[in-house]
Amino acid sequence: MQWNKIKLTFILAFLILNVYLVFQLFPQEETEQTVLETESQDAVLGSVKGYKELSDQKTETNQQYEATKLHFTEDDLDKVPNNDNMDLDISSNTQLVVKFKEPQKLPVEFPIADDNDQAIGDLNNFVTDHVLFGAEYTYWGRQGNQLLFFQKMNQGQTYFSPDSLLLVTINEDYEVVEYEQTYIKNFKKLEENEDQDLKEYSEVQAVKALQSQQLIESNDTIKVEKGFYPTIELSSKPNYAPAYMITVNNEKHYFYLLLPDYPYVYAPTESGFLSSLQPETEETQ
């Protein structure tokens, strides 16, 4: 009888020991896995050109912004530079459509590389000379026969917003035949968001998030810029989230959006953006 008690005691002791070892083993494996992943990420980013120059200071927050759409008036039409060669239409109220009576030759030759600062500057100057508030728009790129320019606010550049867009149409001779313009003003912090506990983010944090999704690989070249990306409108006013734009190898653009709940990585395309601007047909409604 005594021997049975001793055996039972040993069995229980071994069971308790096994349970203890299991609980000790799993955290250790998770820790080792985390260390390996961190070491792997550090090795990749260590070879990425432009990474060492980034700041790890958390200087940006997820404070959301809002703006007001400009409603164009007849007085605005009188302020359009060189408007004697234009037919102007503001029938849609928040969009100005301009058609040139005589096509305007651009001061550049296509294609234009993203790092051709001289050509991009010449395009921006052309817009300044022919567009209302033209100095506030910055050239983004070309998609087919259309050139995209996005409005830049005092707080930073906006990206892929239908409400702060200049869309220039060119013909087969690379001459400007028309453009469509939207414009925002009163760009400010969203009041409903000001009382919330804001989270802080850094350039390094944004880049690491991309690398963890294998969007940045060894020996890539990156460039990080700050700006604002449109979000779902919670009212009649356009809403924007702060964003880090990460350009990889001067080809692919990713946006690390600082949304209210959690960050989100998004990679828009020019073609997709332009398609979203097209009005719905009766078949798709």
What are these language model-derived features?
Residues 169-207:
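Short helix-loop boundary/capping segments
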Residues 194-285:
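Extracytoplasmic/luminal low-complexity segments enriched in Pro/Gly and acidic/polar residues
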Residues 52-61, 189-191, 264-269:
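Noncatalytic linker/hinge segments flanking ATPase motor cores
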Residues 96, 145-147, 174-177, 263:
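Hydrophobic residues embedded in beta-strands of well-ordered beta-sheets
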Residues 128-172, 225-258:
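Exposed beta-strand-loop-beta-strand "reactive/processing" segments of non-cytosolic proteins
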Residues 1-138, 143-147, 153-157:
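Preferential activation on post-signal-peptide N-terminal prodomains/segments
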